[in-house]
Amino acid sequence: MTKSVTVREARLGDAHGFVRAYEAAWDASLAPIVGKPLGELASFEARVARFQAAVEQFSANAKGWVAERDDEVVGVAVYARESETTGELRALYVAPDAWGTGAAQALLGAALDAMRENGLEEALLWVGEANARARRFYEREGWSVDGAGRQSTLGPVEVRYRRTLS
C-alpha cells in the first residue's frame, strides 16, 4: 500500500533525492520543450552541490521543501524573497510517478504559507510558455499571467504568473 505524500523543509541530507525528483520531473515535462534531458545540461554531482549550497543559505528569505512518499523524495519546491513585498516560487517539480497525488499542491501550499508568514503580499513565478501542464496547474491554483515574458537561458520563452497572498 502506498503511503500518502508528506511535505517537510529540505535539509542537506536530501540532496540526492531532491536532485533525482527534480531530474525526473524535468525530463518528463521540460526535456520535450528544451530538447535535452537535464543530465545533458549539468552533471548530477554539480546539481547535488548546487542544492547543498542553497540549503546552507536558507533563511526567512529563501526556503525549500521536499515531498516524500514511501520514504522517497518525489517532489521539491523552493521560494526566495524577490522584494520587500514579493516572493518568487523558484522551483516546483514533482516526479511523474507522483503526479496526481497532491504532492504539487502540498509543496505549493508550504511555499505560499512561508511567504505569508514572512509578511509577503504577493507571489510570482516564471514558467515555460509551452509548458501547458504546469500552466494549467498554476491557473487552477489561482495564479494569473501578468503579461511579462522573457527568453530563458535554455531557449524557450517563459511567462510570468502572479497571485496575491491574502
Which residues fall in each region the model found?
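Acetyl-CoA-dependent GNAT
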Residues: 5, 9-97, 105-114, 149-151, ...
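C-terminal "cap" of GNAT-fold acetyltransferases
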Residues: 3, 121-135, 140-141, 147-166
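Short coil/turn segments at alpha/beta junctions that flank glycine-rich nucleotide-binding fingerprints
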Residues: 101, 118-121
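Generic detector of contiguous secondary-structure segments
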Residues: 8-10, 15, 120-128
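Short polybasic/polar patches that bind polyanions
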Residues: 99, 116, 139
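Active-site acidic-Proline motif in GNAT/NAT acetyltransferases
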Residues: 95-97, 101, 129-130
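Intrinsically disordered, low-complexity regions enriched in Ser/Pro/Gly/Gln/His and often acidic
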Residues: 19, 58, 119, 136-138
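Short acidic-aromatic loop segments in the C-terminal HATPase_c
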Residues: 93, 143-144
